């Protein structure tokens, strides 16, 4: 072992690129615990475990938020009092950055596109899911926000939701904000919308094919949300040269890819090669 790489969820505004870990870096990761409470503590534990097991070997932190740091202010700022951004760094960061960065560049190579100007949309669709838009490999926009809760319908995450829903559920169910956020993170998405059927897209698809009403509605909403994001990003970039799929569902679900391409994106000039799609 020459070196050890660590995917760290949230770098806040502190990190704009990968970095060799030292005590200052670990302290900064700790300072981002409140931004990534589900992931950053575990990420730091992994780093410290590797330091003990492999003393003297360099550890490199690769931040999920780095790709989204390339967005312009019009994309990353929320329409809330600006003081909250200045005081607390509240903004849209985006996640799955290592995936979006790599896949967008690979799509450019595969398609023989102009590496400086190619407009690429990447659909990272797995249990966690996000869509990104980039021009020449630089992030223009991405669907996740301050946390990975924003954006697409995911396995157990709600994705986009009216913020007032949180207070409404708190009042109706006598729950704390933390309890409701836990529901939105761990009990919503495909799992919640299907009535607790499953967080796995394969199970939802199978149930929908058997006539399960909520499963069908959930699957329709799932693809519809993806289609909307891709459409909005094509508009934001004034066109798109390539749409790439990755992650568990994106890579392996033939039907989801086919439905998105045929049902929603014909106006973009998308034509799916069914033989290649089944390969």
Located regions from the model:
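Short beta-strand-loop/turn "lid" adjacent to the catalytic site in phosphate-handling enzymes
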Residues: 1-39, 58-60, 66-75
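Glycine-rich phosphate-binding loop of actin/hexokinase-like ATP-binding domains
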Residues: 67-172
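Phosphate/ATP-binding catalytic cores across multiple sugar-kinase/actin-like superfamilies
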Residues: 102-110, 217-238
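Beta-strand segments within the central parallel beta-sheet cores of soluble alpha/beta enzyme folds
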Residues: 117-123, 178-187, 242-244
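A mobile "lid/hinge" subdomain adjacent to the ATP/sugar-phosphate binding pocket shared
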Residues: 173-218
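Glycine-rich phosphate-binding loops at beta-strand->alpha-helix junctions
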Residues: 241-263
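Short mixed-charge
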Residues: 266-279
């Amino acid at each position: 072992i020459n070196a050890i790489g660590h995917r760290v969820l949230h770098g806040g505004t502190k990190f704009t690129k990968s970095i060799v870990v030292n005590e200052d870096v670990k302290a900064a990761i700790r300072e981002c615990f409140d931004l990534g409470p589900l992931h950053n503590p575990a990420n730091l534990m992994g780093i410290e475990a590797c330091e003990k097991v492999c003393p003297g070997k360099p550890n490199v932190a690769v931040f999920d938020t780095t790709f989204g740091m390339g967005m312009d202010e019009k994309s990353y700022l929320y329409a809330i009092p600006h003081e909250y951004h200045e005081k607390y760094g509240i903004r849209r960061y985006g996640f799955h950055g290592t995936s979006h960065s790599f896949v967008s560049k690979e799509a450019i190579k595969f398609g023989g596109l102009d590496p400086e100007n190619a407009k690429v949309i990447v659909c990272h669709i797995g249990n966690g899911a996000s869509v990104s838009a980039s021009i020449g490999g630089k992030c223009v926009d991405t669907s996740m926000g301050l946390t990975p809760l924003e954006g697409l319908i995911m396995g157990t995450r709600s994705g986009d939701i009216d913020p007032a829903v949180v207070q409404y559920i708190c009042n109706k169910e006598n729950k704390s904000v933390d309890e409701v956020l836990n529901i939105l993170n761990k009990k919503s998405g495909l799992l919640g919308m299907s009535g607790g059927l499953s967080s796995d897209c394969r199970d939802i698809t199978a149930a929908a094919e058997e006539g399960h009403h909520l499963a069908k509605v959930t699957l329709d909403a799932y693809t519809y949300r993806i289609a909307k994001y891709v459409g909005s990003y094509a508009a934001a970039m004034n066109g798109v040269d390539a749409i790439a799929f990755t992650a568990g569902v994106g890579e392996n679900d033939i039907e989801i890819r086919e439905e998105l391409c045929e049902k929603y994106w014909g106006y973009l000039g998308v034509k799916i090669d069914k033989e290649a799609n089944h390969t």
